[in-house]
């Protein structure tokens, strides 16, 4: 004889209390404990399971938030209240009904119900701390691991001139004078060519490229790389530049020697901009690495590989800016805007300063090849 099916009803109290219980609301069962629910009530009863409804307002729960199953609305309300340390007042008797329809009518009673149902203020603070730690981990990880800015900074510091005293360049009008600005700049560039190769070797992945490609990249970008360096070194100098040899060349001296126009461009488009934004050495190193990894350099065996390296520097620099200067969202773009000026000035400097004659009778490719094949000269 079949056992008659028993109908079970779910007892619910008042709307306020309906969402206040943390006990599971059992669905009706048929034979052998198997759920037997009319089709039209399946959706309603599945939502009545505690973990599927918001303990605060009865809306659909999106999961456990701050210790309590709740909807996104109540989760966000509680988080905002705690993070901004907000206080509310009730216009009635502090017993307002909080349900899906009326949850926004009284913030005081809604917040009190959040606390009564077990939401934890400390869980909000812990979430913020975890997010901060995750952000720091991402900065030091995903975007940065292929092209660590720490290594780029190390490269900058390793080749930094160790000059202790700086000498004011003589303002002699004679172009043949040993203290002529053009001669001084050329001599400084001559010296810096050696350290430039050492710097490039320390940039992540540069030494992994074919030797011929290394030579091509340095030959294509070395004038811009040197100009970027002495421009940044000159941030603290008024109306002049500071060379790696320790000489300070004043703009008056440059004008007397006939290179005033390009000198002024260096001061206004590079030095002053770097000074105004307080560009740090990590950012300088990244900009120089971007110049170094130029996929448009003629003769490269694999331009796409060089382009991929440049994109890694972009990503690392952007992550660094967001982490180090979170209050300056446009800083990364502002840094990149210095590159066109650097390129233009670099081309002009080649016309004025005859850089390709700096190393005497040795062809620059031979010189670079010998330097790249040699072990690190700077420790």
UniProtKB/Swiss-Prot annotation:
GO terms for biological process: cell differentiation; nervous system development; positive regulation of transcription by RNA polymerase II; retinoic acid receptor signaling pathway. Residues 265-285 are annotated as: Required for nuclear export. Keywords: DNA-binding, Metal-binding, Nucleus, Receptor, Transcription, Transcription regulation, Zinc, Zinc-finger. Residues 1-24 are annotated as: Disordered. A zinc finger (NR C4-type) spans 54-74, 90-109. Residues 1-53 are annotated as: Modulating. Composed of three domains: a modulating N-terminal domain, a DNA-binding domain and a C-terminal ligand-binding domain. Homodimer. Heterodimer; with a rar molecule. Binds DNA preferentially as a rar/rxr heterodimer. Receptor for retinoic acid that acts as a transcription factor. Forms homo- or heterodimers with retinoic acid receptors (rars) and binds to target response elements in response to their ligands, all-trans or 9-cis retinoic acid, to regulate gene expression in various biological processes. The rar/rxr heterodimers bind to the retinoic acid response elements (RARE) composed of tandem 5'-AGGTCA-3' sites known as DR1-DR5 to regulate transcription. The high affinity ligand for rxrs is 9-cis retinoic acid. This is Retinoic acid receptor RXR-alpha-B. It comes from Danio rerio (Zebrafish). The lineage of its organism: Eukaryota, Metazoa, Chordata, Craniata, Vertebrata.
